[in-house]
């Protein structure tokens, strides 16, 4: 059995564990079990990814890549454990918002990497690849700045008052129209300037979307950003041809959106 087949089988097992984790987290009685399923699924996913990276042909760049991978795992694990231990339960929403910003930033970086180091593809596949890059960068950039603003508001490092700009809804609408126009242009002619433009546009839109919402509604915003981070992860999965990222991203995106809907109804918000 090839390394890719083993990794794909591990990804399927991890995806099933993530689904079981969501099911467990839906009830207070099974919450701890759900967390354990999630930990097990993530451990399997990381192990499969490391195994896949070690199974290829070895060269000088392979050693460098493995060194960076190990360093990232160690640094990320240490920081994650430290933050999880020192944060109080009342500070959990701001910590989650900060985590979402990392997911968004990752989607932006992966999208840019996919654009700068694109393989030779047929015209049809190249158009699909360009659309994946553009959409992934757009969603990721919105998630990144939106999550940063949510973190700053929840941690009282930024005023919780909503930012009211003249015609703010029209600004958001024009930004979305601009995204559609830029996407079509980039699919036709994938130029670096268009990618820079959509990145700046999405960063500004993410900041404005969350800054214009008051601090009292931040729990709903964090839930919505959770959904955005899921779709950003799914877009990253399409770029990397990683089925696990696509499945888990869709799970997080859909569950986050539904949770936001429930919270809006409970808080009498539109």
State where each predicted segment sits.
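Membrane-interfacial segments at transmembrane helix termini in multi-pass membrane proteins
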Residues: 251-270
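Transmembrane helix-loop junctions at the membrane interface of multipass transporters and ion channels
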Residues: 57, 113-124, 188-193, 220, ...
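C-terminal ends of transmembrane helices
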Residues: 17-32, 77-96, 147-162, 205-218, ...
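Small-residue-rich segments of transmembrane alpha-helices in multi-pass membrane proteins
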Residues: 37-50, 97-111, 168-180, 224-237
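Structural signature of hydrophobic alpha-helical transmembrane segments
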Residues: 2-16, 60-76, 129-144, 187-201
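Loop-to-helix transition at the N-terminal end of transmembrane alpha-helices
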Residues: 30-46, 64-71
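Transmembrane alpha-helix boundary signature
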Residues: 49-66, 70, 81-91, 108-124
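Mid-bilayer segments of alpha-helical transmembrane spans in multi-pass integral membrane proteins
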Residues: 77-82, 101-116, 133-149, 262
């Amino acid at each position: 059995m090839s390394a890719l087949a083993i990794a794909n089988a591990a990804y399927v097992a991890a995806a099933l564990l993530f689904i079981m984790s969501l099911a467990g987290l839906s009830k207070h009685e099974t919450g701890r079990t759900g967390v354990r399923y999630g930990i097990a699924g993530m451990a399997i996913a990381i192990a499969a990814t490391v195994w896949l990276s070690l199974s290829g042909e070895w060269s000088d760049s392979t050693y460098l890549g493995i060194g960076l991978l190990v360093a990232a795992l160690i640094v990320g694990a240490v920081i994650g454990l430290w933050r999880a231990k020192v944060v109080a339960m009342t500070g959990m929403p701001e910590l989650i918002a900060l985590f979402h910003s990392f997911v968004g930033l990752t989607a932006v970086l992966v999208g840019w990497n996919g654009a700068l180091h694109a393989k030779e593809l047929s015209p049809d596949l190249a158009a699909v690849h360009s659309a994946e890059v553009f959409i992934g960068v757009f969603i990721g950039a919105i998630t990144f700045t939106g999550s940063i603003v949510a973190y700053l508001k929840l941690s009282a490092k930024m005023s919780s008052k909503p930012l009211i700009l003249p015609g703010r809804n029209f600004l958001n609408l024009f930004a979305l129209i601009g995204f559609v126009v830029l996407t079509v242009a980039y699919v036709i002619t994938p130029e670096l300037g268009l990618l820079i433009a959509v990145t700046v546009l999405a960063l500004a839109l993410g900041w404005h979307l969350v800054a214009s919402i008051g601090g009292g509604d931040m729990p709903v915003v964090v839930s919505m950003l959770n959904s955005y981070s899921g779709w950003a992860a799914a877009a990253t999965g399409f770029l990397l041809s990683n089925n696990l990222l696509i499945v888990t991203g869709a799970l997080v995106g859909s569950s986050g959106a539904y949770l936001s809907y429930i919270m809006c109804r409970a808080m009498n918000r539109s």
